[in-house]
Amino acid sequence: VRKMHACETMGAITVICTDKTGTLTQNLMQVHEPNFYGLKDGGKLADDDISRLIAEGISANSTAFLEETGEGEKPKGVGNPTEVALLLWLNSQKRNYLELREGARVLDQLTFSTERKFMATLVKSPLIGKKVLYIKGAPEIVLGKCKEVILDGRRVDSVEYRSTVEAQLLGYQNMAMRTLGFAFRLVEDNEPDDCVALVSENNLNFLGVV
């Protein structure tokens, strides 16, 4: 026992609820409510720049894979369950994550850690012909590294929009939902290929919450 107060907590328990996978749960995560503020329909990708950035960011800033199954069956995920859920959502939006991932050349990457609470990947994007930094992680952490929030057709200061995001997060938390925040930043060619340095500038653009 690392913390003694845990013993007191365990001693106060009177009922333990357990579950066998397949009865209450399915050992599967799925995207419930994507909320990307820059999309006209926050839950659906379209044929615009923001949609392309979202799709490329989810594809490249991930280490999970989907394995093909029998005809008519849903692809099987391999890797982090949260990332698998995001790839399955992309698949439902008719986006080929593998083509997007293979097309975006990775220049630098920060894998997720419990200390940082985010993952970041810098790629050379063939979609826009520039370097792009993608980041996903705990929404409050990701938002704190952003200068602006991308809305439909405009940008707002992230400080002004923070209360709106926090209210949405509280709603998701009350429904026992796990949430992720997404952000990006266009990077000039003369800037270093260093995720740590780029993220620390707190100059990202917040895309939304899933």
Residue ranges of model-derived segments:
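Conserved cytosolic headpiece of P-type ATPases
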Residues: 1-210
